[in-house]
């Protein structure tokens, strides 16, 4: 069975359009909703199971009815990646497994008052675990809070989800070089910069990383309005694409 990944959000905490900004990218997004960007998140479908990657969307309860998905897979506990959990936890129904890094603090009072969310499913770096037949490997990332990317594998597919990060730790880079993903969804918040940014990648960083990893298809996510404005005037190299909210990626 094929693996399907849908990008439900491709922006950062600021979103696109950014409040009060009149740059070309923000003006375009106000005119045309297809250019809007919500918090970085995704949906993985495999073996009739649905996994939600991160929970930054405000309308999760409207998008998903009880029992319509199996679990959350969190990259980290910054607010723009978990804010949708706060109202959802007070719902009625069966417990919902939440897989994620062993962050002792979490976010605000989520751990103290989890409601129907089951946060006991902490994962460890490079230790493979199974989600309804999907093999998942947590990959340490470079961010201001404990953050994991994930390599998602089936018998025929290999997809990497790498957000939020500034570059990659050496062990993660080596692992991806030796386990080349067919598709790599990669944090790229910034246009090319002379200096390497903190917490998120710029385009120069992503290009350099893929010279090592050599994924044939790189899809950029966590896009800022500044990068969108740059993209309106510049083209990406072959093999690189800009993700958009609602983008569906099938990997046979």
UniProtKB/Swiss-Prot annotation:
Positions that bind Mn(2+) 1: 76, 78, 143, 164
Note accompanying the cofactor annotation: Binds 2 manganese ions per subunit. Binds 1 zinc ion per subunit.
The EC number(s) this enzyme carries: 3.1.4.55
A GO MF term: manganese ion binding
Domain of life: Bacteria
One of the GO biological process terms: organic phosphonate catabolic process
Coiled coil: none
Any Pfam family hit: Lactamase_B_2
Record InterPro entries: Metallo-B-lactamas, PhnP_MBL, Phosphonate_metab_PhnP, RibonucZ/Hydroxyglut_hydro
Positions of Mn(2+) 2 binding: 80-81, 164, 222
Residues annotated as binding Zn(2+): 21, 23, 26, 225
Cofactor(s), names only, from the UniProt record: Mn(2+); Zn(2+)
Keywords carried by this UniProt record: Hydrolase, Manganese, Metal-binding, Zinc
Effect annotated for changing residue 78 to A: Has 250-fold lower activity
Catalytic activity reported: alpha-D-ribose 1,2-cyclic phosphate 5-phosphate + H2O = alpha-D-ribose 1,5-bisphosphate + H(+)
Miscellaneous information on this protein: The sequence shown is that of strains K12 and B.
Role played: Catalyzes the hydrolysis of the cyclic ribose-phosphate to form alpha-D-ribose 1,5-bisphosphate.
Name of the featured protein: Phosphoribosyl 1,2-cyclic phosphate phosphodiesterase
Species for this entry: Escherichia coli (strain K12)
